[in-house]
């Protein structure tokens, strides 16, 4: 049976607005830092501004690299395309796939990642799951909870029921 489907991540209006507003604020701050950098003479201030510009750049590249763009599932496994890079979860490593809602996560705490900029992406933690990787661009959509032998993933997906049904039917 040939199984290969692809869906795009759908952003909620909250994620869209958070991303737009934060991008504008960061861009204005970045322009201000660069403008101040160009017009600053004392070496100590130039060094401090250089460090701030470098840190802001690294944080922005990291935040953007986490943003998921599409999800593909096939007989080999589940593939998450991101703006920079991708994640592959092989079928053989998947122990279970279930459909959950965001409310079932009981307000997970962010350990390292984005709390709304481009989605809720990165490492999160809650009492029930422990540490897990989350790629959620819409808290109101159904979520896939994928558990492997060493990791847990929570992924927003409009096709969560279909993916769960197909993988569970394949006797994983």
Task: Annotate the PLM regions.
Residues 41-53:
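Hydrophobic alpha-helical transmembrane segments
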Residues 56-98:
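Conserved beta-hairpin
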Residues 27, 53-57:
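Hydrophobic alpha-helical membrane-embedded or membrane-associated segments
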């Amino acid at each position: 049976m040939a199984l290969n489907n692809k869906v795009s991540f759908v952003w909620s209006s909250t994620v869209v607005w958070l991303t737009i507003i934060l991008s504008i604020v960061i861009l204005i701050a970045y322009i201000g830092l660069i403008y101040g950098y160009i017009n600053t003479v004392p070496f100590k201030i130039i060094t401090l501004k250089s460090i701030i510009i470098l840190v802001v750049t690294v944080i922005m590249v990291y935040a953007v690299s986490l943003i998921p763009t599409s999800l593909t599932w096939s007989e080999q496994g589940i593939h998450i395309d991101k703006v920079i890079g991708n994640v592959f979860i092989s079928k053989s490593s998947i122990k279970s796939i279930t459909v959950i809602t965001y409310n079932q996560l009981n307000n997970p705490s962010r350990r390292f990642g984005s709390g709304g900029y481009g989605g809720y992406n990165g490492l999160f933690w809650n009492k029930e799951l422990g540490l897990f990787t989350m790629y959620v661009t819409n808290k109101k959509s159904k979520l896939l909870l994928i558990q492997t032998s060493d990791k847990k993933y929570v992924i927003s997906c409009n096709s969560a029921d279909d993916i769960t049904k197909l993988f569970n039917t394949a006797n994983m």
